[in-house]
Amino acid sequence: MSQEIFLKQRKDEQLGQYSALEIACYITNYCNKKDYNITHLRLEKILYFIQLYYVKEIGSILFWEDIEAWSFGPIIPEVYRQFRQYCSFLIDPIEEYWDLSEGLWKEKKKKYISCINQKDKNNINKVVDMCEKYSTTELISISRNQTPWIKAYRRNMIRKIPISYLQEFCNNI
C-alpha cells in the first residue's frame, strides 16, 4: 500500500524540536530497515514513549504537536491523519513526500531525507528498539495505565495530554 505523505520538513533550531510527522517518517523507515513491524497504531504509541523519554532523560520535548488521550491510548492527530489509511496493515518505507513548506498551492514532490540529527536518531532508535520487545496491544495497555493518559482521558471526549502531565509522571518514576 503506497502512502502520500504531506510534510513541512523543518526543525526548530532554537528549541531543538521537530514535527511529529518528521519523527514518524524516520521511525517508519528505521522499522522497515530493521525488519520491525510498524502499523499506524504502533507508531502512535512509539511516538508517545519517545516524547516521555525526552521529557525524562533530556528535559525537553522532541516534537511540538499535542498528544491526545483517545480510547486506544495516546495519539498525535497530525500523524494519525497521515497514516490512518493503513489501518492495521504494515506501513511501507517513506521514500518521497509532498513538500508543503512553500504553501499548499506550491507543493513539490521530493525524495525523503531525514533532517533529524544523529544524536536524536540514536535516542529515537533506543526507544524504538525497547518498544520492539512488546506487542502493539501491550504498548497500548502500558500507555493507558500511565497517569498522563489516565488523567487526561474522558470517555467520548478527546482531550490533550499536557506536557506537565508527562513531566509530573517522569518525576515520579
Positions of the model-derived regions?
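Domain-edge interaction signal
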Residues: 1-173
